[in-house]
Amino acid sequence: MGQKVNPIGLRIGIIRDWESRWYAEKDYADLVHEDLKIREYINKRLQDAAVSRVEIERAANRVNVTIHTAKPGMVIGKGGSEVEALRKALTQLTGKREHINIVEIKKPDLDAKLVAENIARQLENRVSFRRAQKQAIQRAMRPGRKGVKTMVVRRLGGAEIARSEHYSEGTVPLHTLRADIDYATAEADTTYGKIGVKVWIYRGEVLPTKKKAEEGGK
């Protein structure tokens, strides 16, 4: 089971939270499509800003968007000009008040989305798929890191028959629900067609917090 399903979806409600946090009844479908448009617009506009994920929260007619990025300076711009232009564009897109928060990713080598996109960009620049994967694993597996696994799929090296090839180091316990595993995919557009990239990064176990029961008379 753990080998097949999305590791993030499997852990939602256990050690992971939803990336869209709001409640709606009749207009639920419209808001889901609106979230999709917001994410697509941000990822397209900030495709060079190393954006990992976008979290969306809603309250009344206000939308709070949190952008996790490894290059906050590029997102904010000089004097906040870029983030203000982005806020106005999103307000025009949705017709609602938009508030944008920027969160810096301090360890991009531990972010599966950024690692997958880095491998994809190297493949587009004609770097060997073996070399791209091995370099990504070496950067991720520094002292104290638990494990990482990468996989590339399709016509590797221009071969006639599609295949997959993966590399791993350390442990990636997909069946352990308390294991904090980050997972992401990316696509590389090459002269031989698209190549799919998958990355799993194990960042250690997340143990539930123990609530201390208050005992009377102590």
Curated annotation (Swiss-Prot):
Q: Report domain KH type-2 positions.
A: 38-106
One GO term (biological process)? translation
InterPro entries noted in UniProt? KH_dom, KH_dom-like_a/b, KH_dom_type_2, KH_sf_prok-type, Ribosomal_S3_C_sf, Ribosomal_uS3_bac-typ, Ribosomal_uS3_C, Ribosomal_uS3_CS
Q: Which Pfam families match?
A: KH_2 (PF07650), Ribosomal_S3_C (PF00189)
Family matches, as PROSITE patterns: KH_TYPE_2, RIBOSOMAL_S3
The record's keywords, sorted A to Z, are: Ribonucleoprotein, Ribosomal protein, RNA-binding, rRNA-binding
Q: GO CC terms for this protein?
A: cytosolic small ribosomal subunit
Q: Which GO terms describe its molecular function?
A: mRNA binding; rRNA binding; structural constituent of ribosome
Check the record and name the SMART domains matching this protein. KH
Family as reported in the entry's similarity comment: Belongs to the universal ribosomal protein uS3 family.
Q: Which NCBIfam families match?
A: rpsC_bact (TIGR01009)
Q: How does it assemble?
A: Part of the 30S ribosomal subunit. Forms a tight complex with proteins S10 and S14.
Protein role? Binds the lower part of the 30S subunit head. Binds mRNA in the 70S ribosome, positioning it for translation.
Instruction: Supply the name of the protein.
Output: Small ribosomal subunit protein uS3
- Native organism: Geobacillus stearothermophilus (Bacillus stearothermophilus)
